[in-house]
C-alpha cells in the first residue's frame, strides 16, 4: 500500500516536545514552532482531512506551553499499541533505541534539533500548492547519529559548567581581581563590596542607635531588634530583650562586682587601671609619645607596637618557612597558607596558589617571558 496516499491527520505531521526539549528552545524558535504548527493544522483542515481539534492546537492558540509527557507522544503510544496493520516489521525484535546507551545518545540529537530553528520551517511545513498532501513526518530522534563526543554511558557528557565555574571564568575574563588578596569577583560592584573587608569601611548605619555595619543584610537583621517585641525585661535597669538568653547574659553586668565606674558614660570596670585606660577615650589624651617620630598613643602597648616600625623588629616567625612578621594578625593570616590546600598549581614552574586571581596573574608572567 502506498503510504503517500493514506489519509493524513494532524497527528501524523505534528511535532511533539518533552518538557526538557521545550526548555532548550529560544523564544524565537518557540514562536516559529507555534506559527508552523497552526499553519499545518489549517492546511490539513482545508484539504478535508479534518478531525477533532487536537489538544496541541488548543494550547498553541491559548499561548500555553505545548510540551507533553513522553507517554503522550505518538511514537511512545505507537510502541504501546504495536505496529499498524500492513506495516513492515523490523527484523531485529529489540529496537536499538530501547538500549540505555542509545537513549543517552538521543539527548545530543535533541540539543542539535533545538539549535536549528530553521529546520522547523524547512522540514515540517506542509505544501498544498499542487493539491497533494504529502506525509511530512518529523525528524526522528531515534535515527542513528553520525558522531558523538561520548561513547561511555556513565560519562557526564555535555554537562554545562556550573554557576561557580561560569562566575570564575567571567571574573578572569573581566579581571575583577582584588589587589589585596587576589580574589576574583564576577562584577565591579562585588569587587567594591569585597574591598570593604580590607579597608574596614562600614557604610551602613542604623538610624535608631547609630551602629554601623559593613553589609546591608547585617543592617536589616539588626533593625529587627528595634521593631520586634521584647518581652524579657531586666529588673535592675529596665532594659528589654527579645530573647531570654540575651537577658541572662545581660544580668551578669549587675551580678558581677565592678566597683570602678566611669563618670561620663557609666560603664563599670573590675580594675582601676581599666577605668583609667577607658577615660582616655573621653578626654582624648594620648600620653605615650614615640621618641622617633613624635606620634602619640593612648596606651603603652600601642606605643610598643608602633616602635617596631622604626626598629624593624619582627618577633613573630613562621616555623614552616621561617618568614617573620611584625604584627600578630599578619602572622596568623600567613599560617593559614600552610594549613589550606592550594587548588591552583602552575604547570610551568609548579608554584601553587589559593586564589584564582593570583594564579591567573602568575600565568601571564610566563606568557610575557618574565619568568
Swiss-Prot record:
Disordered: region residues: 71-143
First and last residues of each zinc finger (C2H2-type): 176-198, 204-226, 232-254, 260-282, 288-310, 316-338, 344-366
Nucleotide-binding among keywords: no
Cellular component GO terms held in the UniProt record: nucleus
Keyword Cell membrane: no
Any Pfam family: zf-C2H2
GO biological process: regulation of transcription by RNA polymerase II
Segments of skewed composition (Basic residues): 102-112
Residue span, KRAB domain: 8-79
Transmembrane stretches, start-end: none
Cross-link (Glycyl lysine isopeptide (Lys-Gly) (interchain with G-Cter in SUMO2)): 144
Keywords noted in UniProt: DNA-binding, Isopeptide bond, Metal-binding, Nucleus, Repeat, Transcription, Transcription regulation, Ubl conjugation, Zinc, Zinc-finger
Subcellular location: Nucleus
Annotated SMART domains: KRAB, ZnF_C2H2
GO molecular function: DNA-binding transcription factor activity; RNA polymerase II cis-regulatory region sequence-specific DNA binding; zinc ion binding
Residue spans of biased composition, Basic and acidic residues class: 89-98, 113-128
Main location as per UniProt: nucleus
Function noted in UniProt: May be involved in transcriptional regulation.
Family note: Belongs to the krueppel C2H2-type zinc-finger protein family.
Protein name (record): Zinc finger protein 707
